[in-house]
């Protein structure tokens, strides 16, 4: 093993096994540790060992034992040692290390070093490693360089270092002098592109500090009046940035900054980003000094977007920054459409990085311009066929984001083509597509139910093995709720034709989704297929073939999947009242009896229960084993601020037999105990996989109150409920809150706004903690409220933590053209 860095790297790369590599690294690490302890080690060998230490750092090994030695190298007068020491310190230390205190004096000395490259090293390291204490101690030295240096190289480094220091310690804004920046910009001899980059960095740090301040706390605890002392002087630089950006975007390219025919794209991107921060802070603080330039900025962005070459990487970088700025500031609609067209050009290109960036950005801007994004559906569909899995995933997410009633059929057909081409390696993409397709049909009303069932038929056939039981449950609900019996019958006929004839090889044993849905449909609608006549496959679909198929599945899955066996038992019981041939009915009875002594307790219990059912008279069985009624899901109505659905479910145990027989349960309603609301699983209810029927809570008094409140609203406008609490009071309006429910992870509440004077164009903006998600309903009955009248808004909050709400209100008072702003916070006693 050689002693040089090169030989060490060669030995590590040449290791044939992981154990050999580990042995080489461990041995070399021990040697380095030993040699660094030697006070008499020559500088040259000490330098080599630090180089090896940095290589160990790159490999992810522990290097803490070399931190002090790195600092010692910085103190050397030899520039080579100093450079290596600063590099090692930058990599091996961070701002939390106590060793940083040892650096203070060394950095201070090097900041006054006669060699500008030594000063540059100190500035770079200080920017990387600065802690708030180090920033306060050494900022005056950095400021001195900014004030007095005429060297563009040092100025560039000093400005970027100052940007890091100011962002690290906000109190430095008190001593920061914006006139220094103005002087630099006005001096053509030192204001090179590198210095301009430094200027943009320091302004970005100052503006980001402003963004982090609350709007109603203009004068912070550090005593700085940000709007007047900082933003107003900074706004004087806006015109200069506009001129420089416009000049760079013109055809007058300086050869020294030409990148693929574009003038310094790095600086252009930084200036655009800086201007974006200007206007974000200006809007936050309502600064006219900044906002007066907004129209000019829109015009400039339009010229940049139009003139920049989108075929080159450098041009794409500028255009991407332009698009981000357009949507971050929510500029006018023509600019937003222009931005989306730029992203569509990126999609049409061949570079995968550009495609990914475009898809990711389009996904974020869909809520702002959904129609404009939908126009480029062709490019999005092409990305679904890309070889890069990350691009396919982003294209999938975007496809579902733009899906609506107008393009439902076209997009779903595209997604079905996508599923047909996937293999098992694309499992994540398949599962994502299936889940979102099922959710789409679950939440949207599709008029063509036959087409909808065809989609599910193809999903089950292509990728049924990837569908989890929860989504199978949703599919069965959708099938069950299909209104036309002929559509259900045709759906089952197609499934049976494939499973019973010679093409059954199309469906593998692993396709559990197909088998579960088919077994359930056989039990529910087997008589429909038989009664309507066998139009297609008349010799295949009959009572005997269906019975034999169930027996085949029983043999196939007895040892591997008890869930399917549960479904088979229920299907056999239901078919006993749908079949007429005694021989087949007896086979079904024997199938059920075969599990009366099963080692699985739940299966044994079910089999014995079903045997008792089986022996009942046909008239009793027909009533009990009727086809499932339409399944109603519990949903919330937030459209136009409507109250929760009146059909609240009782927390009494569900009497399944009484429910099937159509009898009303007369058990007294108990008060809610706050248990989690649990949705009824249609599969478990039918196939009896659990002994206990699901119970869900209900507050009878609250139901009566809600129903009464809804009736009052329908007849005479919104009125305050008795349990509403006042959470805000001002000279313009009162705000009340009524907490409808606050179960584990989910809360529903209504806000009531009572006007004291005429309020028009009321807009509400609500925020919750990061661990929670808020869904906001519309104002009902109107956003205009006369004096003493009330409007209502429904809120749904999900997540975890203490229930807290921040509400901001914008409105016009008494017909005034000016907008009144009010804001308040409220903490509820409940916890999600």
From Swiss-Prot:
SMART domains the UniProt entry points to: Alpha_adaptinC2 (SM00809)
Pfam families named among the record's database cross-references: Adaptin_N (PF01602), Alpha_adaptinC2 (PF02883)
Chief subcellular location: cytoplasm
Gene3D superfamilies (alphabetical): 2.60.40.1230, Leucine-rich Repeat Variant
Entry's Gene Ontology BP terms: Golgi to vacuole transport; intracellular protein transport; vesicle targeting, trans-Golgi to endosome
Mode of membrane association: Peripheral membrane protein
Domain GAE: 733-832
GO MF assignments: clathrin adaptor activity; clathrin binding
Subcellular location, record wording: Cytoplasm; Golgi apparatus membrane; Cytoplasmic vesicle, Clathrin-coated vesicle membrane
Keywords from the named record: Cytoplasm, Cytoplasmic vesicle, Golgi apparatus, Membrane, Protein transport, Transport
One Gene Ontology CC term in the entry: AP-1 adaptor complex
InterPro entries from the UniProt entry: Adaptor_Complx_Large_Subunit, AP1_complex_gsu, ARM-like, ARM-type_fold, Clathrin/coatomer_adapt-like_N, Clathrin_a/b/g-adaptin_app_Ig, Clathrin_app_Ig-like_sf
Subunit structure and binding partners: Adapter protein complex 1 (AP-1) is a heterotetramer composed of two large adaptins (gamma-type subunit APL4 and beta-type subunit APL2), a medium adaptin (mu-type subunit APM1) and a small adaptin (sigma-type subunit APS1). AP-1 interacts with clathrin. Also a component of the AP-1R complex composed of at least APM2, APL4 and APS1.
Note: Present with 4850 molecules/cell in log phase SD medium.
Functional note: Adaptins are components of the adapter complexes which link clathrin to receptors in coated vesicles. Clathrin-associated protein complexes are believed to interact with the cytoplasmic tails of membrane proteins, leading to their selection and concentration. The AP-1 complex interacts directly with clathrin. Component of the AP-1-related (AP-1R) complex, an adapter protein complex that mediates sorting of cargo SNARE SNC1. In contrast to the APM1-containing AP-1 complex, AP-1R is incapable of sorting CHS3.
Protein name, UniProt field: AP-1 complex subunit gamma-1
Gene that produces this protein: APL4
């Amino acid at each position: 093993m050689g002693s040089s860095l090169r030989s060490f790297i060669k030995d590590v790369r040449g290791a044939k096994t992981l154990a050999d590599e580990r042995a080489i690294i461990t041995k070399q690490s021990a040697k380095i540790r030993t040699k660094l302890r030697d006070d008499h080690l020559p500088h040259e060998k000490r330098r080599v060992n630090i180089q090896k230490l940095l290589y160990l750092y790159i490999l992810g090994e522990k290097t803490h034992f070399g931190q002090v030695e790195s600092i010692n190298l910085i103190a050397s007068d030899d520039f080579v040692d100093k450079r290596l020491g600063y590099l090692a310190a930058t990599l091996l230390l961070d701002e939390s290390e106590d060793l940083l205190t040892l650096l203070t004096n060394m950095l201070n000395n090097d900041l006054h070093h006669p060699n500008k490259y030594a000063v540059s090293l100190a500035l770079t390291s200080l920017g990387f490693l600065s802690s708030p204490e180090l920033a306060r101690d050494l900022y005056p030295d950095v400021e001195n360089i900014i004030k007095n240096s005429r060297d563009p190289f040092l100025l560039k480094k000093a400005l970027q270092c100052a940007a890091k220091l100011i962002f690290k310690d906000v109190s430095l804004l008190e001593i920061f002098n914006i006139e220094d920046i103005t002087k630099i910009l006005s001096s053509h001899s030192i204001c090179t592109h590198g210095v301009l980059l430094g200027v943009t960095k320091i302004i970005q740090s100052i503006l980001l500090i402003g963004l982090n301040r609350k709007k109603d706390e203009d004068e912070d605890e550090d005593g700085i009046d940000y709007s007047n002392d900082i933003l107003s002087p900074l706004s004087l630089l806006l015109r200069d940035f506009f001129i420089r950006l416009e000049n760079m975007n013109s055809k007058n390219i300086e050869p020294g900054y030409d990148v693929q025919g574009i003038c310094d794209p790095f600086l252009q991107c930084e200036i655009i980003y800086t201007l974006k921060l200007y206007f974000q802070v200006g809007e936050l603080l309502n600064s006219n000094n900044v906002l007066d330039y907004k129209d000019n900025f829109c015009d400039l962005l339009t010229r940049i977007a139009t003139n920049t070459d989108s075929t080159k990487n450098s041009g794409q970088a500028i255009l991407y920054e332009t698009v981000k700025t357009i949507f971050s500031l929510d500029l006018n609609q023509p600019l937003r459409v222009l931005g989306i067209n730029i992203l569509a050009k990126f999609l049409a290109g061949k570079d995968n990085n550009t495609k990914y960036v475009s898809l990711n950005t389009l996904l974020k801007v869909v809520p702002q311009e959904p129609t404009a994004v939908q126009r480029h559906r062709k490019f999005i569909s092409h990305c679904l066929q890309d070889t890069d899995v990350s691009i396919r995933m982003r294209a999938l997410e975007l496809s579902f984001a733009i899906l609506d009633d107008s393009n439902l059929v076209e997009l779903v057909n595209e997604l079905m083509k996508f599923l047909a081409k996937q293999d098992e390696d694309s499992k994540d993409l398949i599962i994502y597509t299936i889940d979102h397709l099922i959710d789409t049909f679950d939440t949207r009303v599709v008029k063509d139910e036959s087409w909808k069932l065809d989609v599910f038929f193809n999903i089950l056939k292509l990728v049924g093995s990837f569908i989890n039981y929860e989504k199978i449950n949703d599919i069965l609900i959708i099938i069950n709720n299909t209104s036309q019996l002929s559509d259900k019958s045709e759906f089952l006929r197609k499934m049976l034709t494939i499973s019973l004839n010679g093409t059954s090889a199309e469906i593998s044993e692993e396709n559990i989704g197909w088998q579960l849905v088919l077994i359930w449909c056989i039990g529910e609608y087997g008589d429909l297929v038989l009664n309507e006549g066998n139009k297609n496959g008349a010799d295949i679909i009959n009572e005997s073939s269906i019975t034999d198929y169930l027996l085949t599945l029983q043999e196939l899955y007895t040892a591997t999947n008890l869930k399917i066996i549960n479904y088979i038992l229920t299907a056999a019981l239901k078919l006993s009242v749908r079949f007429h041939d005694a021989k087949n009915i007896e086979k079904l009875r024997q199938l059920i009896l075969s599990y009366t002594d099963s080692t699985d307790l739940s299966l044994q219990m079910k089999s014995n229960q079903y045997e008792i059912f089986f022996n009942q008279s046909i008239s009793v069985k027909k009533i009990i084993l009727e086809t499932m009624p339409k399944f109603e899901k519990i949903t919330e109505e937030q459209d136009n601020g409507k109250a929760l659905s009146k059909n609240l479910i009782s927390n009494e145990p569900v009497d399944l037999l009484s429910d099937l027989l159509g009898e009303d349960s007369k058990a007294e309603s108990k008060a809610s105990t706050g248990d989690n609301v649990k949705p009824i699983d249609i599969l478990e209810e039918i196939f009896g996989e659990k002994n206990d029927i699901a119970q869900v809570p209900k507050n009878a008094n609250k139901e009566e109150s809600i129903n009464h409140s809804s009736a009052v609203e329908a007849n005479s406008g919104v009125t305050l409920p008795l349990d509403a609490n006042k959470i805000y009071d001002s000279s313009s309006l009162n705000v009340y809150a009524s907490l409808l429910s606050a179960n584990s992870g989910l809360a529903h509440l209504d806000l009531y706004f009572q006007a004291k004077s005429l309020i028009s164009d009321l807009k509400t903006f609500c925020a919750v903690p990061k661990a929670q998600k808020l869904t906001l309903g519309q104002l009902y009955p109107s956003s205009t409220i006369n004096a003493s009248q009330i409007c209502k808004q429904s809120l749904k909050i999900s997540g975890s933590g203490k229930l807290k709400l921040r509400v901001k209100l914008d409105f016009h008072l008494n017909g005034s053209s000016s907008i009144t702003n009010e804001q308040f916070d409220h903490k509820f006693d409940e916890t999600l």
